[in-house]
Amino acid sequence: MNPYLQQLYNIAQKPVRHILGLMSGTSLDGLDVALCALRGAGPNTQVELLQFSTVPYDAALKAEIRQVFAKREIDFQHLCLLHPKIGILHGQMINACLQEWGIPATEVDLVASHGQTVYHAPKTQHGLAEYGNTTLQIGDG
C-alpha cells in the first residue's frame, strides 16, 4: 500500500484522533484554529473541542490578500505566489497555537484546512443552471 494511504489508514484505526481544523473566511480577520478529539466513526462519531484560538491577520497580509480577493480581474502571478505563502503562514500560526497550548505537534494526527477563501461564485451570481455554488481557496503547503 502507498505509505501515505497506510498512514491515513492507521490514523483512522485509532480510538481517538486529534485533528486541527482551520477556518479563514471572507472577513479576513484571521485564522481560526480548533483542536478536536474525534472518537468513533460514521454516525457514532463523537467530537470534543480541546482548544480554540483565533490568530489575527496583520495589516500587511490583509492588504496582500485583498489584491486578489473577490475580484474578477487579478494578477495571476501574485495569486500563484500567495498560494504557498498562505500555506506557510497558516503552518506558522498552527505552530504558535500548539506552543501556546503546550501541545507537541507530534500529538496532532491531521490538519483539516480548506485554505483562505478569495472568491465566491454563488449560482445566483453566475446564473449557470448546470453549476452550483462555488468558491476558490488558496493556501498550499
Task: Annotate each predicted stretch with a short phrase.
Residues M1-G141:
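Short acidic/glycine-rich loops and adjacent helix/strand connectors
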